Amino acid sequence: MTDTLRIGTYNIHKGLSSFSVRMVLHDQRELIRSLGVDIMFLQEVRGKHDRHSRLFTGGQYEFLADSIWQSFAYGKNAVRSNTDHGNAILSKYPIVQWENEDISAHPTEERGLLHCEIEVPGWDVNLHCICVHLGLLGSWRHQQLIALENRIKSMVPEGAPLIIAGDFNDWRQKAGNTLAADLGLKEVFEHTMGKPARSFPSVLPFFRLDRIYTRGFDIKHTKIHSGPRFANTSDHAALTADLRKL
């Protein structure tokens, strides 16, 4: 039985470098492996891309999962003529159920909530994980946070451990008010550092866009993964947190 988890979140920018100059998916895979996480929340993941099909078979999430994270789920949100992208969750433990809920607030910006139930050995209840990538406008994010709140209240048992992570695009830092007050969630960097992590742009992080919210855990350690290695592989820094189940 394990009562501790390391989890991470990372917007991989569709497998492209910070300024979309080159494909860096192989580098991203090595960086994600180096984080040592049990569960990884990913945003801007391509499910397919006709031009890149010769580089790897299947979606980017399968390539990144490789043999390390043997269970994974992909929520397709945006579909174009030759490609699609969305959110993904990679897990070392079995994903026993998952659903992708459309929370798009505008036809030009498709968004979703990827909700997975994960069976962690020795736990008496399943772990609920929700990967999010919220909209660019405040009014859109407001609608999407309401959808997130409604889903949690209706689909997540009150005593079940819960992790919500991803790119909240919340540069005005308003999401936490809803999630903390109404749902009893803690943002891990607020807990350890007093404020959410600066995660964007990765070359010199300033904006606090990416978040990890938890319920039912003791937050042991948090880390922002930026610097040259990460700046060369995405426009976002990666975040990790070590958690112990209460």
Positions of PLM-derived features:
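Active-site regions of metal-assisted phosphoester/phosphodiester hydrolases
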Residues: M1-I39, D66-S67, S71-Y74, R80-L246
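Short, flexible/disordered intra-domain loops and linkers
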Residues: S17-R22, G47-G58
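Acidic/histidine-rich, surface-exposed loop or edge segments in extracytoplasmic proteins
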Residues: L42-R46
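Glycosyltransferases and closely related glycan-assembly transferases
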Residues: H52, G59-I68
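Secondary-structure junction/capping motif
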Residues: L55-Y61, K186-E190
